[in-house]
Amino acid sequence: MVKTKDYYTSQKSEFFTQFDGFCERVGALIEKKYGEKFKNDVMGEIKREFELIFDEIPYIGGDENFLTMDLVSAAQDLALYQVLKRYDKPVEEIGEIAYQESEQYLRDNADLIPPMTHPKYVFYIEMAAKGSLEREYSGDWAYEFIPGDGENDYGLDFIECGIQKLFHEHDADEFTPYLCAMDIPMSECGNLGLHRTQTLAEGGDRCDFRYKGGRKTEVASTVIKKG
């Protein structure tokens, strides 16, 4: 069984293939906003930055933790942020590019969004939540399962966030709320009916996810005014 950092080494080819797709999408968005020359100047830097960050992604259980992919995906956005900040681009513009990339990917690949309101998946999430509270890995999320009450199929209260921890280590706290906002298109494209009023990254004491399949997504965000 692959353990600790060996996991990322064993999966590097797959993760970097996914990163190539990310680069195609953000490259088009960067060119649209800043021009072809700027895109050509920075894309190589973004790829090198991701290679550096990739080597520092904390192990949180590998394939046994469904949030591992979220952490790797966030590292892609972090590479984008770090490079564009060096070119003095404001966080609002970087965040807009990152959000648009995520929105495009989710709309084009809605079939890949986990069926988070399906009863079998809800049971899996409940078990995962219990395991997260053991805090086996310092870079992981910790979250509590909230049983359904009629109004919601179920909820999750995140009290620790792996993305927030990773971004804090890289002095990217101002960028974290844009990753929170990406839950909006995920809910819309997956028909998850997410309601959320606060996040850790935006000053809350938890991220209060509440799911109800089929209803309208309503997510409070300090950076994206939508949903």
Question: Which stretches of residues belong to each language-model region?
Answer:
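N-terminal, charged low-complexity regulatory/assembly segments
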Residues: M1-L84
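Hydrophobic, Leu/Ile/Phe/Ala-enriched alpha-helical segments that form helix-helix packing faces
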Residues: I30, L84, S132, D183-M186, ...
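Short coil/loop linkers at secondary-structure junctions
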Residues: K37, P90-V91, D173, G193
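A short, structure-level motif marking secondary-structure boundaries and short turns
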Residues: E64-F66, F167-H170, V219, I224-K226
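Short, conserved micro-motifs enriched in small and acidic residues
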Residues: L67-L71, E174-A181
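Amphipathic interaction/junction segments at domain boundaries or subunit interfaces
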Residues: V72-H170
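Non-catalytic recognition/regulatory regions in large multidomain proteins
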Residues: N152-D157, F167, A172-L179, T197-E202
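C-terminal structured interaction module
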Residues: P177-G227
